[in-house]
């Protein structure tokens, strides 16, 4: 993540984000970020975040290094989260997978708002796991503030509210009206600059959404986008699909770098993640409809149910709201599929009755990690 910062992608958007951060420090407060792919302005939090390194230097390598450091912090947070909720063994496996994954590295070293999602998502998940074990109002406030920051980093995070609400209902979260109101006020407070911009501009930018021509829900193009978004969720959690980033030179790169064997292991990761998703989706449905006692349910099971709700309901929302299929729209799902794949692998290792099977599974993990590092 911190190596070869001189070959990072740095084009107009990256320059404009640094420019906004610089203006925020030296000129006037930044109220909005850059326009999104649908024309709606991003909220300004990413510019505020970049103002930390920009206050020292505007060198693209330095600012990108800051983003990479944030993501290294994200790996540490992932270790804490996985160890606390699941096990030490799973924590090491999932951190190894994320640390070496080509796509995860790609989305951790660029001056781009989606590249900063992972550490904030993990702080949110850690706080949520703590709340499930010991509910307090203060943790609700922290989660509300984190959601305000996460939704500012990328608008796809707005679709998190559906699965989170359903999850809160399922686990019968002891939310008081007071805590919800305070959390809502904190959320609104962190959106004050963005709201201010829209008020002083008579909400002209918001009118763009109503004027956009979008396909109908059940049109062929929207169905194709929905399917592609599901594919991208799994592709960017493996090493497949790198042709999207390497472009026209990918075929030559593929042949000259002998990528056939690594792609076999990438496909295995993709298959295990897909299998794990189906497995935990079925388990979640059974658990919900059997009306198990949630107080006696392990935190790890609750978190896996939340993850399946996020995967299912967010992709349903992508379909209903006609979200175009782009890989960075699926960074919001990090590190869910890595955890699911690691859980399947660790469970298989525990249940293996033969030392040969256990050694084979360890060898497979090592081959996957080596393939990740080789391609990276």
What role is predicted for each listed range?
Residues 11, 103-115, 155:
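Short acidic/glycine- and proline-prone juxtamembrane loop motifs at membrane-interface regions
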Residues 166, 185-188, 345-376:
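Signature aromatic-anchored transmembrane alpha helix within multi-pass, membrane-resident enzymes
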């Amino acid at each position: 993540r911190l190596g070869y910062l001189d070959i990072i992608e740095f084009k107009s958007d990256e320059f404009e984000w640094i420019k906004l951060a610089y203006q925020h420090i030296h000129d006037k407060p930044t109220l909005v970020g850059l326009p999104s792919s649908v024309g709606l302005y991003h909220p300004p939090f990413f510019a505020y975040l970049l103002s930390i390194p920009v206050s020292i230097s505007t060198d693209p390598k330095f600012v990108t290094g800051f983003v990479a450091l944030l993501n290294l912090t994200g790996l540490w947070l992932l270790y804490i989260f996985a160890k606390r909720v699941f096990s030490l063994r799973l924590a090491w496996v999932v951190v190894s997978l994320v640390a070496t994954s080509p796509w995860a590295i790609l989305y951790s070293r660029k001056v781009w708002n989606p590249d900063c999602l992972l550490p904030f998502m993990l702080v949110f998940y850690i706080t949520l796991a703590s709340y499930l074990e010991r509910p307090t109002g203060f943790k609700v406030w922290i989660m509300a503030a984190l959601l305000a920051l996460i939704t500012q980093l990328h608008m796809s995070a707005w679709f998190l509210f559906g699965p989170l609400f359903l999850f809160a209902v399922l686990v019968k979260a002891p939310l008081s009206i007071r805590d919800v109101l305070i959390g809502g006020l904190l959320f609104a407070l962190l959106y004050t600059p963005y709201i201010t911009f829209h008020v002083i501009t008579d909400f002209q930018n918001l009118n763009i959404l109503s004027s956009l021509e979008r396909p109908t829900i059940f049109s062929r193009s929207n169905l194709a986008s929905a399917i592609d978004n599901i594919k991208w969720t799994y592709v960017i959690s493996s090493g497949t699909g790198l042709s999207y980033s390497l472009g026209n030179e990918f075929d030559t790169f593929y042949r000259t770098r002998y990528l056939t064997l690594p792609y076999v292991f990438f496909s295995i990761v993709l298959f295990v993640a897909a299998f794990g998703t189906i497995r935990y989706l079925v388990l979640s449905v059974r658990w919900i409809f059997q009306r198990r006692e949630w107080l006696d349910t392990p935190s790890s099971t609750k978190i896996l149910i939340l993850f399946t709700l996020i995967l299912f309901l967010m992709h349903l929302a992508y379909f209903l709201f006609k979200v175009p299929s782009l890989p960075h729209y699926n960074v919001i799902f990090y590190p869910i599929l890595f955890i699911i794949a690691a859980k399947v692998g660790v469970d298989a290792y525990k249940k293996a009755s033969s030392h040969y099977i256990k050694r084979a599974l360890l060898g497979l993990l090592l081959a996957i990690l080596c393939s990740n590092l080789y391609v990276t």
